[in-house]
Amino acid sequence: MRYRFDNSPSLRVLPYAHEKMIPHKNSIRPAVRTASIALLTLFLFATAARAQEPPNPKAPPSERHEFVISNFKTESGVTLPQAKIVYGTYGHLNAAKDNVILMPSHYMADYHGYEWLIGEKLALDPSKLFLVTTEMFGSGHSSSPSNTPEPFHGPRFPVTTIRDNVEAVHHLLVDELKVTHLRAVIGFSMGAEQAFQWSVSYPTFTDRIVATAGTAKCYPQGFIRLESQINAIALDPVFNNGDYTKQPTKGVEAFALIWTAWLYSQEWWRDELWREGAKPGTTFESTLNEYKTNFIPGGDANDIILQMRTWERHDVGTTPGFDGDLKRALHSIKVPVLYMPSETDLYFPVGDARYESGFIPNVTLKPIPSLWGHTAGAAPNPADAKFLNDAISQFLRENAN
């Protein structure tokens, strides 16, 4: 079976792949948003959309930065004159520059998405470590279809890969921060995809990686799910193949419903765990409507699609030198790996993690015993937060150089 990739170097949607592109005359810029795990459990915790600010009021202070790469060539062959990476930092870089941990963002997230790990009594103590949290292309803050001028605005923005994101952050670390080695790369979901890619593309750049609720490849079932979500947006007449003059709200809401169906486990819905932390009087219908209408507050449709295209193309086996051989790429990983799938994840099934673990030389497979599906990998409740922090703390201690 052949995947139906649109191999155009620009952002396209399959149902419209042969239609003539129309110049985009009106810029639709997304409202600035906080896309953290508080977003993933948006209704449960009644988290409102805010400008980029910490979802955790007890989170340590962070600093926001921007790094611009001139003439950044993507894997598609398209060169962006200026590629911007937005990132946050916690703590201070020591003189030896050897206290750095990288945490790349998950889907449509900003740089605050790992604050469940950051704190004096948590796995990552910013008084001792320098933590760098980056935002992927398409976040709406880093270079994205919504914020890039013509000729790369909207659907003309190039499709970017996980490797493109890794390469951009490698430039950031080496050229901007003068950091040539990391203590760890820690990632959730698409952040886990980036962590695996780091360990294959730059096998000695980091001492170890941690991957929660994410795999080294997007498998066929995941590809089909992503295509269904992309098509849900594209079938909104307002979308106009990405050249819209207002957001395709109906399409984005249809996308959000599909996404929500896969976000948690069947048991989570059956046991009505959505009631935990919910306001009095909350119903299933109101919960579902909240996800439908407010899943990615202010999100731009082209940005949403771009990151799904990035996700679809993820495969460490296609890294140059491995000729599409996933097993050989995984076997090349030289550093210890803490692999933490959620036992009930429908996005990244635990079976895929078990399969991949069989080819990684030094792996600790530690599934998260949770009913919270995919979100379990980002600490959506106290039990999962404790399990993750304890496991990651132990792994970092045991594998310290």
Give each language-model segment a name.
Residues 363-401:
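Catalytic active-site module of serine/aspartate enzymes centered on a nucleophile-bearing elbow/loop
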Residues 205-206, 211-294:
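Alpha/beta-hydrolase-fold enzymes
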Residues 181-220:
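Conserved hydrolase catalytic core segment
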Residues 346-352:
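Conserved alpha/beta-hydrolase "acid-adjacent" motif
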Residues 52-103, 111:
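Catalytic-loop region of hydrolases
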Residues 88-151:
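N-terminal cap/lid subdomain of alpha/beta-hydrolase-fold enzymes
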Residues 333, 339-341:
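Short beta-strand/loop motif that positions the catalytic acidic residue
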Residues 163-183:
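Conserved acidic catalytic loop of the alpha/beta-hydrolase fold
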